[in-house]
UniProtKB/Swiss-Prot annotation:
One of the primary rRNA binding proteins. Required for association of the 30S and 50S subunits to form the 70S ribosome, for tRNA binding and peptide bond formation. It has been suggested to have peptidyltransferase activity; this is somewhat controversial. Makes several contacts with the 16S rRNA in the 70S ribosome. One of its GO terms (biological process) is cytoplasmic translation. Belongs to the universal ribosomal protein uL2 family. This is Large ribosomal subunit protein uL2. Part of the 50S ribosomal subunit. Forms a bridge to the 30S subunit in the 70S ribosome. One of its GO terms (cellular component) is large ribosomal subunit. GO terms for molecular function: rRNA binding; structural constituent of ribosome; transferase activity. It comes from the Bacteria. Keywords: Ribonucleoprotein, Ribosomal protein, RNA-binding, rRNA-binding. It comes from Chlamydia muridarum (strain MoPn / Nigg). HAMAP family: Ribosomal_uL2_B (MF_01320_B). SUPFAM superfamilies: Nucleic acid-binding proteins, Translation proteins SH3-like domain.
Amino acid sequence: MFKKFKPVTPGTRQLILPSFDELTTQGELEGSSSKRSVRPNKKLSFFKKSSGGRDNLGHISCRHRGGGVRRHYRVIDFKRNKDGVEAKVASVEYDPNRSAYIALLNYVDGEKRYILAPKGIKRGDRVISGEGSPFKTGCCMTLKSIPLGISVHNVEMRPGSGGKLVRSAGLSAQIIAKTDGYVTLKMPSGEFRMLNEMCRATVGEVSNADHNLCVDGKAGRRRWKGIRPTVRGTAMNPVDHPHGGGEGRHNGYISQTPWGKVTKGLKTRDKRKSNKWIVKDRRK
């Protein structure tokens, strides 16, 4: 869900933000009427120093980054390898480092871990990992154990490496087929890809599906996120960009990056690497 605002100021005229109705409030934990958001678990978070888009030499390696509010990184359990131990969802929380929400799990043996919050999960739900787990939202198991047609997320590319695929808000992959130790998944991009059947995945879709509908509404909100302004190449001088210069506006060039690489239609996948695991390309 998301909410729109009355245009009482220029910054709220186009503003669309998540409603955060799925998140647990401090009042729910304390039994009060407080609507404050839950603070992250101290043992599972640490201060994340911003790079400002610079590499180890101090050079700008990623443009349009810098500033923004201080962030604490939440340590997420992407491996979900605590098998056979049931966990209770203590809270569903906001994470500034990703588009999806996260859920804090309290295991029966006392351990606590953060996971990506699946769609529909709420405080008090119970989840479990490992073979023989029920096929319900939030449970994690190997791909060979999950029936065909089930939607999954946080999928491993190699057994034991931790979830790498399908982790952004609102995404899910669908299990299409199982053959000779491999499982075919339909990815969110439309690509059909084969993975080892021993790779793990979590049942359900990722939370915060309306993330793509949100509008920042003003430049200042982008700066809070650490995003700096973008200058068009045509507004630059020839020394700064291939599109720069010219008397007036000139449009007789192929769209390029500041370093002369073609931006539209250029294939970026390494030709030397095997694509035998891709059953069907997303473009076909």
